Amino acid sequence: MSFVIAVPEALTMAASDLANIGSTINAANAAAALPTTGVVAAAADEVSAALAALFGSYAQSYHAFGAQLSAFHAQFVQSLTNGARSYVVAEATSAAPLQDLLGVVNAPAQALLGRPLIGNGANGADGTGAPGGPGGLLLGNGGNGGSGAPGQPGGAGGDAGLIGNGGTGGKGGDGLVGSGAAGGVGGRGGWLLGNGGTGGAGGAAGATLVGGTGGVGGATGLIGSGGFGGAGGAAAGVGTTGGVGGSGGVGGVFGNGGFGGAGGLGAAGGVGGTASYFGTGGGGGVGGDGAPGGDGGAGPLLIGNGGVGGLGGAGAAGGNGGAGGMLLGDGGAGGQGGPAVAGVLGGMPGAGGNGGNANWFGSGGAGGQGGTGLAGTNGVNPGSIANPNTGANGTDNSGNGNQTGGNGGPGPAGGVGEAGGVGGQGGLGESLDGNDGTGGKGGAGGTAGTDGGAGGAGGAGGIGETDGSAGGVATGGEGGDGATGGVDGGVGGAGGKGGQGHNTGVGDAFGGDGGIGGDGNGALGAAGGNGGTGGAGGNGGRGGMLIGNGGAGGAGGTGGTGGGGAAGFAGGVGGAGGEGLTDGAGTAEGGTGGLGGLGGVGGTGGMGGSGGVGGNGGAAGSLIGLGGGGGAGGVGGTGGIGGIGGAGGNGGAGGAGTTTGGGATIGGGGGTGGVGGAGGTGGTGGAGGTTGGSGGAGGLIGWAGAAGGTGAGGTGGQGGLGGQGGNGGNGGTGATGGQGGDFALGGNGGAGGAGGSPGGSSGIQGNMGPPGTQGADG
């Protein structure tokens, strides 16, 4: 016997669509009627006239048939529309009597037993912790439990009757000051068919205590799976712990155990539910950060496998696999260990869970893989402390004859982490009787301190001044050169500005050249931290006591990735050229801008971490079976990426040529930009895990498992990008811009990691870093 359903809304929509299609076809037929029925003869002869009449008769026959088809289509659409209306009326007419009939059937059972024959149980009110109502005795799901008031447990889910699912447990109340309350237990599934209800989530922790435990999943009857355990309550913040995940419910005679609930922060995952007679144990819940995963549920009394262990939280072990069925079944696999996370359990990864044991007949479960090692920290360049001290200024010299100002003194050296001091300014050179006046050279920047000190900036050049009456020339002093960055890395110092050349009479004036920018020092740029070692793999489970193979040991965890190298330090900016200034008819020429400093080399990437130790294989059954193979050592971590090379310093701007007396002016040339620094070398890939697990012992008939191999070496880190070349300095008025900085070299790829001995393969060499960007012309 087949069953047919009708949805009035769908029928109405279909009728509307068919009506639209019919309208479109009728419009097309009407448009084609005249051209097809009134075919004009091709010529005046009898044959052409006969052909035109023949084709015209075909068209007339088609349009006559089309008219009949259109009438049938309209009748069909009308019938479909009427049918939809009839279904709507029938539903409305029959709903009330059926509901009344169901009420008559349920009333005696409700009065006598407190539950209906057919129907779902009522949900418990939230905030009261009231349990969910039971489902109908014959058919119906249990109601959901109500959530608990603050600090009070959630209500239990209602039980199903013969057929139906248990209700979900209510959420536990949050703790105001104390602990969160437990979630409600899931309702029991149907006696014949149905799944157990999910346990309620635990309440969140109060200010100082722990979160509530998740509710246990509901059990079930003949056919069906146990309910999932509820999640543990959340932690309230620093110093508090979340709740443990609820255990999974027990499976039916034919059914699986429920999965355990996830643990809150710092709390274990729930244990998987046990299978009854035929089925698989439930999987363990995921552990919260710093806590292990839940163990898998045990297999049934007769035939079935154990549940898998839950994943470990950050830094914690995976759950152990559940034991196989008492008569026949394999042990469950161990859960994977949690990855290492900084600040959680010392930054160590979790070990893989052990595989579950078989009982009489069956193979042991495989051990879980170890967690991934902690990633290395990225290199960080030290900062530079400002230095308030400066070099001594040069002596001012003024008098008859050629006069030259004294040179500025060098800037004082910086202390640890301190920048070098600024060089002293050059002294004034002033000729009072029209001879040459030359400014003193600015002092060199002070030596940078170790551990990140920046190079000191060069001092400004002194002013050169004369009235030119004796044919003298005014020349500004050169700016001092910037100092190189510190030995342990530092930014190069800026070059000093060239001094002004000022001729108040008829002679020429030349601005001083800017100082050269100091080189950035990145040779000892900060290296990335080394990655951590991967976690150990879990041991394989024991094979069945009579017949069965041992479980394979879990692989060691992958080593952590090395940290990236820090960027190289930038080169110093070249000093600006000095101004040439005349008040008469002489030529005024600005000074040339200083060269930009070289960029520093990028830091080396950190070495990848070593792979973890493989787990041991499980022993075989006592009579017949093979021992489990040992787990392989973990794969080495990838080396860190090399740091980007430091940018070259920009060239200094050319000085301006300025006159107030009508003389010629020439702008100074802009300085050449500095070369960008080479990219850092990529980190070496981590060594593969050198220790594979031991093979398990064989049975009376069988042999031992093979020892685990060593892990592959990690991939070498990628070389850093070359630094960008410095921009050429802007030329002074009327001068050509400075030349752009050269391309920088890309960093070398990192060496591949050494494989474990023996059997580990070496890591792949890192890629060459691309060249830096050429600096723009001024």
Swiss-Prot record:
Residues 402-429, 436-510, 718-763 have a biased composition (Gly residues). Residues 125-163, 372-510, 718-778 are annotated as: Disordered. Residues 1-92 form the PE domain. It comes from the Bacteria. Belongs to the mycobacterial PE family. PGRS subfamily. This is Uncharacterized PE-PGRS family protein PE_PGRS46. It comes from Mycobacterium tuberculosis (strain CDC 1551 / Oshkosh). The gene is PE_PGRS46.
